[in-house]
From Swiss-Prot:
Gene designation: gatD
GO MF assignments: asparaginase activity; ATP binding; glutaminyl-tRNA synthase (glutamine-hydrolyzing) activity
Identification of the protein by name: Glutamyl-tRNA(Gln) amidotransferase subunit D
Reactions accelerated catalytically: L-glutamyl-tRNA(Gln) + L-glutamine + ATP + H2O = L-glutaminyl-tRNA(Gln) + L-glutamate + ADP + phosphate + H(+)
Active site residues of this protein: T84, T160, D161, K237
Species lineage: Archaea, Methanobacteriati, Methanobacteriota, Methanomada group, Methanococci
């Protein structure tokens, strides 16, 4: 039995039929069923294997397209960090192959030919849960190289689990007039319900727009009617599996894009780029990695905070309850952090809304102990921002900047309809 064979697997009480797929575990057989879903089966539970049809082995070679640049279209670089948003499927075997040469991308999503001149490049090949701060820096440096070589827009293909962290990091580290669009897919390209193609079409379209800044592009609803463009410091993954999992928080989306007509509708004021500085880019990639994000809960022990301080951590984001509170029993740990010159800042677990530590005595006392309110910043954004500030500024300057807007992470006021 080889990859690509169509087989019938008989278990104790059921039977599975499908195409044999590559498996990461030698004790498991993975098959792709006709429904499009993959199933992994423990070899020890299989009573009988019947090969119904010998299949072709996965073939990834493609004939060169010999594409010529269209002088009327912008030059867009698509950088891959991993994930399945721009993968190509061998439908004979069901195997999924990363598609990141220009030819591969056009083969996978031919609609891109009408939108831009495409260049593809792999900078990482990891699951996004394995993303590290040093990889954010690598991504920023790859963006700089592409822009200096003539890219007029950047699309970053990224796994969805931590895409909002990366978007936040790039928002702080990268200063450029070129639009930088992160895009992912909730459903892989080998599934009938995949959102990959429409997302990447819309992301490339967004990258051709005369805007600047870092954004996340994903489905705007569960169907295929519209994609939303979200600002990189005001977006969060709010559902584990829905195609419209990413939402702007405390703001409306920046724009919506029809993936079929390519129409772009801006929902807020546009950040116009300065075309005279299109090849200029400044990076500030120093990050202090000794920063922690701690969720406050009933009964939380001060020893947790003391542990991080004793381990040499320089900054702590507390995700507090309500308007930004902790139990009084946690005050001892906060005092300990303050005595050791560790910056402590506060966000809220509610996600929507704003920290206001002036309303109740608990919040006022926390402020008196040096805890900095993070306004309406998302916890993940505050975490990344603190890494950035402590990596580039002295602690007193970092304290002052923590509650000030740097990259669109803080709203002066919140529209209740957001």
């Amino acid at each position: 039995m080889d990859i690509g064979d169509f087989v019938k697997l008989k278990l104790e009480n059921t039977t599975y039929s499908g195409t044999v797929m590559p498996s990461l575990n030698e004790d498991t057989i993975v098959i792709k069923m006709k429904s499009g879903y993959n199933v992994g089966i423990d070899k020890n539970k299989i009573k009988n294997i019947e090969i119904l049809e010998s299949g072709d082995k996965p073939k990834y070679g493609l004939p060169p397209l010999n594409l010529e640049k269209n002088p009327k279209l912008k030059n867009i670089s698509i950088l891959s960090t991993g994930g399945t948003v721009a993968s190509r499927v061998d439908y004979k075997t069901g195997a999924v192959h990363p598609a990141f040469t220009a030819d591969d991308l056009i083969m996978a999503v031919p609609e891109l030919l009408d939108i831009a001149n495409i260049k593809g490049k792999v900078i990482l090949n990891i699951l996004s849960e394995n993303m590290l701060p040093k990889y954010w820096v690598m991504t920023a440096e790859a963006i700089k190289e592409e822009i200096e070589n003539g890219a007029e827009g950047i699309v970053i293909a990224h796994g969805t689990d931590t895409m909002h962290y990366t978007a936040s990091a790039l928002s702080f580290m990268v200063n450029s007039e070129v639009p930088i669009i992160l895009v992912g897919a909730q459903r892989s390209s080998d599934r009938p319900s995949s959102d990959a193609a429409l997302n990447i079409i819309s992301a490339v379209k967004a990258a051709t727009e005369p805007i600047k800044g870092v954004y996340v592009l994903m489905h705007g609803e569960t169907g295929d009617t519209v994609c939303h463009l979200h600002e990189g410091t005001k977006v969060r993954k709010l559902h584990s599996s829905r195609r419209d999992a990413f939402k702007s928080v405390n703001k409306t989306p920046f724009a919506e894009i029809n993936p079929f007509t390519k129409e772009v509708k801006y929902l807020r004021d546009v950040k116009n780029q300065d075309k005279s500085k299109i090849k200029e880019i400044v990076l500030n990639t120093n990050l202090e990695e000794k920063v922690a994000l701690i969720k406050v809960y009933p009964g939380i022990d001060s020893e947790i905070l003391k542990f991080y301080v004793d381990k040499g951590y320089k900054g702590i984001i507390l995700e507090g309850t309500g308007l930004g509170h902790t139990p009084e029993t946690f005050f001892e740990g906060i005092d300990y952090a303050n005595e050791n010159n560790v910056l402590v800042a506060m966000t809220t677990q509610t996600i929507n809304g704003r920290v206001n530590m002036n309303v109740y005595s608990n919040g006022r006392e926390l402020q008196a102990k040096g805890v900095i309110p993070c306004e309406d910043m998302l916890s993940e954004v505050a975490f990344v921002k603190l890494m950035y500030l402590l990596g580039n500024y002295e602690i007193e300057d970092a304290k002052e900047l923590m509650s000030k807007d740097i990259a669109g992470e803080i709203n002066e006021s919140i529209n209740l309809e957001c």
